[in-house]
Amino acid sequence: MDIKEYFARISYGGSYEKPDLETLTEIFQHHIQAVPFENLSIHCGETIELDLAATYDKIVRKKRGGWCMENNHLLSWALKTLGYNVTLLGAKVYIPEHDAYADDIDHLLLKVVLHDKSYIVDGGFGMAYQLWQPMELISGKDQPQTPGIFRFVEENGTWYLEKVKRKQYVPNHSDSAPHNVDKEVCRRVYLFTLQPRDIEEFRARNLHLQTAPDSLFVTKSICSLQTPDGVRALVGWKLTEIKYNYKDNMDLVEIRILADEEMEKTLKEKFNITLDKKFVPINTSRLSLF
């Protein structure tokens, strides 16, 4: 594994001599705009592995994306290689339809300590709840970013991530009926503690999420990528493109339903992904991602 090959994959040509916040932010932003959050392996007959070498080969050499346990594992390797103090953490994702957090840890994120300050670095959440910058680990402080206002709230050692959303302008609204468009203002994202984790602790969950019949990732094919001004996502056959703060503190949401014959071209042109095996899209879950 070669850090310069990783930098080429994410199109990063900046300095990396000093492990400071500015460099961390630039590398992070290049990563999320180059490496999709995706679970396409599940839907084209591949297994998602947690071994770092396999993840590196998939994302860096095959120019694929991955989900949290792949993206953030690779990102942790890159940051550690550059001299950053990185700790793996585990989170439970909020499920709006159930008004509850997951029963088990199902999300991997990173804590980076810089000059006695702790930051959460999460390059593997995807969609419209993807952070665009490292977030200082401080409770109750609004931290505005391009996607919206994020904040942490800490209670008895448990940290909660929330996002304050803008209103959304959806020109072709008839194509879209996610339950939360234009309805939620503040959305819970996930909870976590500061207990250090090892990648081995995620193996059982990694297997469960790609094999359980009721898993969101089994019932939805997902590919999302952050763009310079927003995010695009292909969920099943639905292509959603969001431009943040399009006008009057509103996000522009454009939605199109694709035909089967458009999928391969869309993955290549919109996400720079070429799959080795036949991809079978699916979207049978009622759980929303926006």
Curated annotation (Swiss-Prot):
The active site is at C68, H107, D122. It comes from the Eukaryota. GO terms for molecular function: arylamine N-acetyltransferase activity; N-hydroxyarylamine O-acetyltransferase activity. Its EC number is 2.3.1.5, 2.3.1.118. This is Arylamine N-acetyltransferase, pineal gland isozyme NAT-3. SUPFAM superfamilies: Cysteine proteinases (SSF54001). It catalyses: an arylamine + acetyl-CoA = an N-acetylarylamine + CoA; an N-hydroxyarylamine + acetyl-CoA = an N-acetoxyarylamine + CoA. Catalyzes the N- or O-acetylation of various arylamine and heterocyclic amine substrates, and participates in the detoxification of a plethora of hydrazine and arylamine drugs. Belongs to the arylamine N-acetyltransferase family. Keywords: Acyltransferase, Transferase.
